[in-house]
């Protein structure tokens, strides 16, 4: 299966982000959040992730009303080793700091508990 159609779709989506995607990208790009490298509109399998940190296998989705309940997509991504965080556009607009804190907490390496 060719990945060319997904790459073209991802490229088009990078050119026309929503306001909320642009706000989130501004906060994630250039390793601004905890030093983690995020990519935007990245093809993963048959899907295009809004944002992904490949190092932590973490996907962040900024969702409007039509994408928030996408269980099949999330199940496929999780089955392939990714964690998926979803935020509504309203959550991003009203509380970007809270969204970034949740992303940072999910991206941070898990520490073993001391005995």
Report the location of each language-model feature:
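Solvent-exposed, charged helical/coil patches
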Residues: 1-36, 79, 91-94, 107-115
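Basic, amphipathic alpha-helical patches used to engage nucleic acids or provide basic targeting signals
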Residues: 13-18, 42-106
